[in-house]
Amino acid sequence: MEESFMVKSVETITELIGNTPLVKLHRLVSDDSADVYVKVESFNAGGSVKDRIALNIIETAEKDGSLKPGDTIIEATSGNTGVGLSLIGAAKGYKVITIMPESMSIERRQLMKAYGTEVLLTPAADGFGAAVAKAEELAAQPGYFWARQFDNEANPAIHYQTTGQEIIKAFDGKTPDAYISGIGTGGTITGVGRALKEVNKDVEIIGVEPEEAPFISKGQKGKHRIQGISAGFKPSIIDRDVIDGFELVTSDDAIETAKNLAAKEGILAGISSGAAVTAALRVAKRLGKGKSVVVLLPDTGERYLSTGIFGEA
């Protein structure tokens, strides 16, 4: 497996995005199951997998001229992309405005504001589409750059270039038998899936959706508590051809697994991480001993303390 995670000296905070560690699970995995490794994306500078796409979207736009000095970056976000854009905007000197449903966790709003971002809230009852509509309205004005994470090819591209390659390197040029991640924008599973399938066409790429709202797999909308996945529409950047199957996880199971990750493995991760690990444990059981599964943990559980899922203070 990959070499130990090492501290290094860097010139800017953005250099601390990527090269996140893989950690093997022990107490949650049964003896007759495949090995399960979690890719802990909270080790990124801004604390989530979305730091990767935020940096690539901004730097790609700088190179092609669509983002100019003095422009304001705007985005509709469930939180993590907004935090990533806020961090990078602060480091590079851009003003950032984010739009998010009011139902998202308070920690995410606070984090964005800490970086100097202006946060606009849309009614929870209107769903994520209302946040996107507001971003589109602002983007029509001059001097605004809309990150468009659901449609921007810089999103899956960075996961192909970095996240997927990191997994391949960790497996000495090969791949695990299965890779699992939740589907929000679809950028992570698309980019990583493409990278892994170039090396091994037989690797299983499994997407995770809420059982209450499996929109990508079944076209069904519904209320759920797994923040960050199942936006209720199909992002244009998703490559369905790279996805071999889906695992549907209830909100209750996702929360319970997130709690168990913290209590039994010492890994504090968010609700969508709980959903992904729930799915990974099922797949590991099906594959059996001697096989390997990698599952991506998008963020840290610290962003969900106010929801009470880990207990009241």
Residue ranges of each PLM-predicted region?
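PLP-dependent amino-acid enzyme catalytic core
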Residues: M1-A313
